[in-house]
Amino acid sequence: MAPPKTSGKAAKKAGKAQKAISKDDKKKRRHKRKESYAIYIFKVLKQVHPDTGVSSKAMSIMNSFVNDIFERIAAEASRLAHYNKRSTITSREIQTAVRLLLPGELAKHAVSEGTKAVTKYTSSK
């Protein structure tokens, strides 16, 4: 048995009614926020080179780099805490992890900047 035929206008009206119902029933979808270090990377760039810009692709690469380094430091600090039978990762573990992961002069600068940041944080409390 063939389905009943409807005129073109009737089909359009039925379609519009269907759309109106489905539009009202659907809730507005919220976009999930993507966390990024982009604003912080940009602030540092402007401190170092105020007249220099950065492309979105370069910013994405820098963001991936920061995430990768943080992951490596966290993993190394976790390993160090485990070796020493500690359940807490302190600034000491982070400092040792940085010394192990970063080469030479870069490690020295990172440790001094980290120490400065921790001192500033504890003095503000």
UniProtKB/Swiss-Prot annotation:
- Main location group: nucleus
Residues modified by glycosylation? 112
Q: Which Pfam families match?
A: Histone
Gene Ontology MF terms in the entry: DNA binding; protein heterodimerization activity; protein-containing complex binding; structural constituent of chromatin
Q: What is this protein called?
A: Histone H2B
Q: Provide the record's note on post-translational modification.
A: Monoubiquitination of Lys-120 gives a specific tag for epigenetic transcriptional activation and is also prerequisite for histone H3 'Lys-4' and 'Lys-79' methylation. GlcNAcylation at Ser-112 promotes monoubiquitination of Lys-120. It fluctuates in response to extracellular glucose, and associates with transcribed genes.
* Residue location of crosslink Glycyl lysine isopeptide (Lys-Gly) (interchain with G-Cter in ubiquitin): 120
**What superkingdom heads the lineage?**
Eukaryota
Q: Which family does it belong to?
A: Belongs to the histone H2B family.
Q: Which GO terms describe its cellular component?
A: nucleosome; nucleus
Q: Give the span(s) annotated as Disordered.
A: 1-33
Q: Which residues form a coiled coil?
A: none
**What UniProt keywords apply to this chain's record, in alphabetical order?**
Chromosome, DNA-binding, Glycoprotein, Isopeptide bond, Nucleosome core, Nucleus, Ubl conjugation
Which compartment or compartments is the protein found in? Nucleus; Chromosome
- What quaternary structure, including any partners, is listed in this protein's UniProt entry? The nucleosome is a histone octamer containing two molecules each of H2A, H2B, H3 and H4 assembled in one H3-H4 heterotetramer and two H2A-H2B heterodimers. The octamer wraps approximately 147 bp of DNA.
Say what the protein does.
Answer: Core component of nucleosome. Nucleosomes wrap and compact DNA into chromatin, limiting DNA accessibility to the cellular machineries which require DNA as a template. Histones thereby play a central role in transcription regulation, DNA repair, DNA replication and chromosomal stability. DNA accessibility is regulated via a complex set of post-translational modifications of histones, also called histone code, and nucleosome remodeling.
